[in-house]
């Protein structure tokens, strides 16, 4: 390449790459060098890196550019390192011997690590067994501490800074000697800057000593399965051909199901966050707090099944979260238009004025009072304030009084007056008819509401009940969530949204900060659609009889997905990036232009990359033209007197304002091609996509969220009521392309799937203290109905256009991520082969036949190898995940119980809905409040449901088969015990897996309920007829019949 061509290219690329002047490593501004020019670390790819990061990479890193891996050359003023060329510029070593750190942050720091978009930071760190990350020089990176020196005593702070200075002196980066007070303050500031520039999180891969054997065994198991099926297919049981054929089909299905479940767990990872660095980077003393605002959504439907006291505790934990109060807003969706919930929020907002300052003063955890006061721990541990005991007793008494008031509201709501509910001011309650009522919004607390008892502001609390009218589809929970998205966009428009169920309280007050470590990361955050937290539960029996904790899914499957494209969305405990829900695609990574080495001829450069230069240049010019168009539109404001807008809506320009005049956008599209027109969209396209609300459309164009300054919240209520009207979503893309996607009762799977198909990534965050905790149905019938609803949602997705088997192939969804989504929608269909396979042992015992013919010693090796590989896979999976063997076994048992009951019914209900349009009613899972008198009373409570029939039948059938098989062996001699062993083992395998179900039927009294006894008698009568037909007690005659022999003789 010719010199002048290279120079022009460098100038052009430098100008385009450094227009923002943001370091791609630490996110800070790239400052100018001594000559007043923008500092360029790498002259090959011009990857933007600031001087401190450049110097640290040369001294402590791999000395190469993070993007093109070109060896960094020494710049004037930078310290020399081993390997620098002698003729690399003027020698300024005299200036390097006495380097001092500057206030502007241009010095290097000890433990800095550069990051890439996948979170792999190239730092000299070692992973220790206790889970903390230590640098090679011994500084603790993972220890949580407050952002500034306020969290330390003077002695502790001085000791910490002295240690940091000693490390710097040891490396020769600072001079020794006496320092003034001003120098010491500079050192402290530099130390904070150095820590703040560290990455906010890091990826911790599973140790190779644990994951490598696991992967090897998976491959071996796959090979063994191939040989096993080769043997099974080539050696049929000729005397029991139908049984053999059914068993082989079932086994092949199980193998495919195992592949779909196993391979998405190929790349499991862990992640750890650094909350101290988040605070130091975005919460500096004397500066405005730069943490991003968050809108929290809480959804509820029926206050009788979802107790108001549980919902109130969830709201209180949100209001008391450890986050700036002016950056938190809580929206409660009441889809049942219940006056009970409305009154509960009024009482909750009043109690929050005392509860929130108590939590923050004494730093209590958890911040849901019901669960805080019921914890059986030493609550005085680590408490040093002398007033704590007195204040705690007073707060507990106030909470008990608050609880009594809520109970009084619940008791009053049990009997509805004939004329309907009446509000305190005497006006009728608008939601007396739950299926025909207007939209309702009530704002509590916040900047314009009541302050706490200390005079401090509280987070905003908003009650939302969307409009419902006959003839309009409301789309259940998905429709309620979309309504909250629009209301929050009009009132607060936070860039991030936390979704919680009404029974999931915040157990870790720093949970939102944990998610911000990912979402506010300068590299990864732009491409994240959500941060998913695991679900943890209270009130589950120690044995976890029905696998309510779902540990295998949350601690194994989800961590495996985190290493691919991210975990699936599970419906609660998830922090969303608002643009991802609006249907936008993630930003595309900047790719450097390809260049050839100087040793190649120039014509090769032209052939390889030169021809695209003009095209790229034209594209960049048009992009800059588009940006200039937007920049001009940002400066324009226009007042409209349209009835749909608010008369008092302020359009003052601010740093966060990006309100566009949609008519100007349409006029400004002249001269651009169709692709660019579609990217900007005209006013009609905006309205078709988002609906007829100029205020909401304007909010979608604000890159960093927020509202214009001096906006009156009360004046926005009218527009908020408009966006939750029942007809707002008609002829829009809500529920189809944007927001929560409609079409299934498990809207969470569909919503996460669509975002991943667009190329978004997600992150799985597992803090040491669980972020959220909820309640789970420990009763057998309730648990089966919950699993039925999940399975029915998967079946609905399977028969929809969004089925992962055929949707969005060739898109941005990774293949292993697609396998995981396929597994989530096909698993209910496993119930059919599972039911058949669990029936085969009893049939074999009753008929005396078996699915496997007599085999030799060589053939038995494949059976033995298969069993050993299954056991080895389970053991190695437990080894890297930390899951207990009891959790794994309970998961296996409930896989069979749910498979032959709830999943089976879900398949037939789904088929009825698709083929005949028979819709099933959505049943809300009951969230019972805790009862100290009987903590696990629901565990032994029996509730009859048709879901209990198939498992009960299987248990009785296999028990009868065992009795018949043993009787047959005794009657025909002990020579039959050999073949009988395989049949008995098969039958006991079924019975052992169904044992928790059997205990659930017995209840507390260890006796079977009457209705189950009646069903058992009926089934026993049927099997008795079969028994008589088989006649197992009579000896089997192998010779000629006596009657026929007498005739012949």
Swiss-Prot record:
Taxonomic source organism: Arabidopsis thaliana
Stretches of the chain found on the membrane's Cytoplasmic side: 1-215, 261-831, 879-895, 967-977, 1029-1049
Cofactor details (free text): Binds 2 Zn(2+) ions per subunit.
Binding site for Zn(2+) 1: 23, 26, 50, 53
Binding site for UDP-alpha-D-glucose: 299, 305-306, 335, 476
Superkingdom, taxonomy of origin: Eukaryota
Glycosylated residues (UniProt): 921
UniProt topology in membrane: Multi-pass membrane protein
First-level EC class: transferase
SUPFAM superfamilies referenced in this protein's UniProt entry, alphabetically: RING/U-box
Residues noted as binding Zn(2+) 2 in the record, renumbered to the chain: 42, 45, 65, 68
Transmembrane annotation, as ranges: 216-236, 240-260, 832-852, 858-878, 896-916, 946-966, 978-998, 1008-1028
Predominant place of localization: membrane
Active site location: 335, 748
The protein's name: Cellulose synthase A catalytic subunit 4 [UDP-forming]
Consequence of gene disruption: Enhanced resistance to the pathogens Ralstonia solanacearum and Plectosphaerella cucumerina.
Extracellular side: 237-239, 853-857, 917-945, 999-1007
Function of the molecule: Catalytic subunit of cellulose synthase terminal complexes ('rosettes'), required for beta-1,4-glucan microfibril crystallization, a major mechanism of the cell wall formation. Involved in the secondary cell wall formation. Required for the xylem cell wall thickening.
Modified residue annotations for Phosphoserine: 135
Binding site for Mn(2+): 477, 501
């Amino acid at each position: 390449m010719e010199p002048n061509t290279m120079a022009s290219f460098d100038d052009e690329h430098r100008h385009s790459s450094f227009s923002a002047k943001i370091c791609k490593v630490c996110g800070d501004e790239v400052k100018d060098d001594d000559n007043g020019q923008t500092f360029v670390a790498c002259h090959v790819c011009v990857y933007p890196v600031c001087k401190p990061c450049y110097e640290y990479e040369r001294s402590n890193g791999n000395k190469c550019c993070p993007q093109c891996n070109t060896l960094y050359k020494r710049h004037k003023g930078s310290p020399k390192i081993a390997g620098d060329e002698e003729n690399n510029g003027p020698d300024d070593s005299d200036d390097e011997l006495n380097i001092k750190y500057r206030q502007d942050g241009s010095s290097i720091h000890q433990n800095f690590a550069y990051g890439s978009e996948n979170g792999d930071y190239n730092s000299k760190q070692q992973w220790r067994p206790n889970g903390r990350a230590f640098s090679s020089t011994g500084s603790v990176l993972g220890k949580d501490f407050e952002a500034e020196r306020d969290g330390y005593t003077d002695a502790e702070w001085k000791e910490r800074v002295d240690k940091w200075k000693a490390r710097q002196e040891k490396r020769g980066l600072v001079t020794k000697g006496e320092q003034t007070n001003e120098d010491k303050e500079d050192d402290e500031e530099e130390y904070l800057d150095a820590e703040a520039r560290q990455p906010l999180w890091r990826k911790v891969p599973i140790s190779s000593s644990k994951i490598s054997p696991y992967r090897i065994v998976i491959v071996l198991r796959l090979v063994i399965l191939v040989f096993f099926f080769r043997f099974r297919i080539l050696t049929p049981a000729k005397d029991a051909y139908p049984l053999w054929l059914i068993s082989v089909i079932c086994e092949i299905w199980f193998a495919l199901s195992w592949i779909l479940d196993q391979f998405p767990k190929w790349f499991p990872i862990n992640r750890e966050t650094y909350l101290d660095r988040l605070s130091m980077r975005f919460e500096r003393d004397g500066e405005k707090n730069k943490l991003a605002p968050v809108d929290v959504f809480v959804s509820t439907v029926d206050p009788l099944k979802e107790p108001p006291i549980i919902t109130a505790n969830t709201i209180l934990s949100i209001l008391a979260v450890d986050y700036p109060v002016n950056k938190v807003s809580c929206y409660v969706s009441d889809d049942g238009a219940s006056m009970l919930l409305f009154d509960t929020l009024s009482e909750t907002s009043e109690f929050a004025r005392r509860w929130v300052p108590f939590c923050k003063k004494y730093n209590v955890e958890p911040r849901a009072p019901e669960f805080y006061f019921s914890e059986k721990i030493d609550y005085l541990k680590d408490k040093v304030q002398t007033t704590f005991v007195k204040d705690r007793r007073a707060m507990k008494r106030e909470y008990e009084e608050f609880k009594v008031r809520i109970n009084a509201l619940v008791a009053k709501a049990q009997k509805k007056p004939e004329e309907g509910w009446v509000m305190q001011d005497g006006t009728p309650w608008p939601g007396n008819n739950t299926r025909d009522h207007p939209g309702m919004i009530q704002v509590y607390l916040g900047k314009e509401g009541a302050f706490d008892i200390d005079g401090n502001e509280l987070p905003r609390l908003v009650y939302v009940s969307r409009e419902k009218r006959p003839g309009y589809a409301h789309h259940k929970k998905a429709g309620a969530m979309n309504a909250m998205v629009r209301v929050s966009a009009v009132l607060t428009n936070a860039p991030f949204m936390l979704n919680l169920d009404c029974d999931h309280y915040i157990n870790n007050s720093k949970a939102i900060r944990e998610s911000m470590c990912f979402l506010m990361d300068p590299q990864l955050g732009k491409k994240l659609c959500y941060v998913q937290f695991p679900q943890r539960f209270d009130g589950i029996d120690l044995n976890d009889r029905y696998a309510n904790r779902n540990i295998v899914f949350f601690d194994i499957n989800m961590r495996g997905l985190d290493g691919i494209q991210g975990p699936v969305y599970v419906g609660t405990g998830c922090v969303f990036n608002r643009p991802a829900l609006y249907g936008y695609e993630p930003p595309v990574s900047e790719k450097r232009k390809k260049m050839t080495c100087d040793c190649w001829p120039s014509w090769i450069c032209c052939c390889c990359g030169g021809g695209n230069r003009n095209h790229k240049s034209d594209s960049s010019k048009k992009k800059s033209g588009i940006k200039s168009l937007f920049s001009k539109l940002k400066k324009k404001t226009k007042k409209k007197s349209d009835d749909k807008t608010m008369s008092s809506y302020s359009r003052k320009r601010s740093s966060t304002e990006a309100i566009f005049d949609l008519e100007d956008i349409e006029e400004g599209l002249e001269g651009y091609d169709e692709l660019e027109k579609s990217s900007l969209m005209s006013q009609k396209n905006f309205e078709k996509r988002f609906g007829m609300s100029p205020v909401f459309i304007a909010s979608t164009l604000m890159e960093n969220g927020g509202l214009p300054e001096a906006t009156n919240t009360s004046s926005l209520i009218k527009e908020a009521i408009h966006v939750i009207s029942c007809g707002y979503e008609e002829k829009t893309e809500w529920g189809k392309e944007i927001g929560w996607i409609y079409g299934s009762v498990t809207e969470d799977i569909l919503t996460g799937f669509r975002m991943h198909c667009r190329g978004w990534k997600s992150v799985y965050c597992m803090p040491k203290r669980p972020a959220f905790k909820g309640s789970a149905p420990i009763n057998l019938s309730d648990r089966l109905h919950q699993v039925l609803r999940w399975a029915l949602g998967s079946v609905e997705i399977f028969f929809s256009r969004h089925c992962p088997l055929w949707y969005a192939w060739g898109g941005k969804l990774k293949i292993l991520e697609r396998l995981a989504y396929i597994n989530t929608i096909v698993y209910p269909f496993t119930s059919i082969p599972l039911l058949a396979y669990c029936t085969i042992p009893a049939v074999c015992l009753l008929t005396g036949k078996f699915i496997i013919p007599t085999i030799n010693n060589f053939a038995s090796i494949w059976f033995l190898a298969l069993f050993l590989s299954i056991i080895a896979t389970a053991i190695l999976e437990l080894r890297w995940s930390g899951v207990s063997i009891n959790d794994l076994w309970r998961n296996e048992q409930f896989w069979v119980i749910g498979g032959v009951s709830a999943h089976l019914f879900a398949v037939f209900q789904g088929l009825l809905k698709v083929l005949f349009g028979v819709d099933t009613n959505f049943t809300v899972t009951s969230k019972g409040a805790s009862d100290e008198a009987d903590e696990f009373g629901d565990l032994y409570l029996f509730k009859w449901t048709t879901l209990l029939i198939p498992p009960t039948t299987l248990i009785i059938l296999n028990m009868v088969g065992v009795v018949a098989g043993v009787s047959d062996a005794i009657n025909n001699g002990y020579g039959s015990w050999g073949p009988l062993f395989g049949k008995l083992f098969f039958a006991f395998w079924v019975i052992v897996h169904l044992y928790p179900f059997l205990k659930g039927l017995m209840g507390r009294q260890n006796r079977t309920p009457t209705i189950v006894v009646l069903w058992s008698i009926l089934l026993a009568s049927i099997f008795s007829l079969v028994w008589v037909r088989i006649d197992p007690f009579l000896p089997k005659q192998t010779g000629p019949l006596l009657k026929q022999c007498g005739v012949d003789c």
